Structure formats: structure tokens, C-alpha cells
Amino acid sequence: MSLETGIKAKLHTRYPLSSIMIYNGSTVLHYLLGGAGIIIGYNFSSWAGYLFGALYLVFSFVEMYIIMPLTVCPHCVYYKTENSLCVSGLNVVSKRIAREGNPKSFSKRAEGLLCFNNMYIAALIIPIIAILPALIVNFSIPLLVIFVALIALMVFRFFVIFTKIACLHCRAKYICPQAGQMGVREL
């Protein structure tokens, strides 16, 4: 599955359950740890930690599990492909809550400052940025452990999930802006 061997990566019409579990498990864990980190990091205020932690959790879960299936998934090739299952499994959700879109519009998900790709990345980065000052002001070992875990999850997502599990085998990789940036189109 590399350029050295000349073998192309297998494109999945139905991702294996293990890939879906790894993708969603790491996503949910990232969001939950991020919310917990914000709550713990800002617990010096009786309300700030809970408010900002809850806002982050709502933002991240709504962005990934409601907005994406409503706005991005209908334009994906997995929406139209019979009996398909993408790496997040959200094409199945999308088919139940959204009308079919235009696959030619799929690449637009990465256009503009507040595009869906940027919101997805923001949901991953926000807790890391928010926890940094909290570590200085309100240091604790549990907060440091959460911070390190979030960094590890981010590295795992970009260097293992995207490049080896998700994007490498995705049928949309030839039109997806993310796949192009990661260099997995030719693999």
C-alpha cells in the first residue's frame, strides 16, 4: 500500500467496524477529555469552567454529529453509494436526516474561514489552546494528563487515523481537499 511497492491502497465502500470504532472512539474521547480539561482547568471560578466546558462539548458534538451529516455528508460519494459505510458512519445518519446533495460541491467544505473543515479542526484544537493558560494559572496533575492525552490524540488522528485508516481508503479522496493536503491521493 505504498509508493515503494507500487500497490494502491484498497478503497472501501464499507469501512470495517474496527475503523469506524477507532475513528469515532478517538473523536468522542477527544471531545470528552477536552470538555473535562476545560472544566477542571477553570474550576477556580464557580461557573466559568462548567459553562465553557459545556459550551465546548455542545459545539464539538453538534458540529461533528449534527452539522456534518446535514451539510457535508449529503455531498459525499458515500451518501449516494448503495450499502456504503464511511469511516465515521455519518453517511447512514445523513441519509435519514438530509436530502441528497451534489458530489461536485463536496470540495466546498474547505472553502472560507468558517468552513466545515475549519470547524472540525477547531473542535479538536480549542481544548488544547484553552487548557494551556489553565495549566499556568491552575496547574494540576490531572489537567496535565488531559493536556498530554489531547496532544497524543491529535498526533494519532493526523498521523495514523487520517493517513492509514480513514483518508487512505476513502472513495472521496480524489475530490476531498483534506486528502489532497495529506498526500494520500496517489497511495
Per-region residue spans from a language model:
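Short membrane-interface loop/juxtamembrane segments of multi-pass integral membrane proteins
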Residues: S84-C115, G183
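Cytosolic-side membrane-entry/anchor segment at the start of a transmembrane helix
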Residues: M1-I39
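Cytosolic/matrix-facing juxtamembrane and C-terminal tails of multi-pass cellular membrane proteins
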Residues: K164-L187
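Hydrophobic alpha-helical membrane-embedded segments
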Residues: W47-E82, L153-F162
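Cys/His-coordinated zinc-binding microdomains
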Residues: V77-K80, V87-L90, R171-Y174, G180
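Core segments of transmembrane alpha-helices
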Residues: V28-G34, S107-I131
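Hydrophobic alpha-helical transmembrane segments
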Residues: Y42-V58, L135-I151
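Eukaryotic polytopic
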Residues: I121, I129, L150-K164, H169
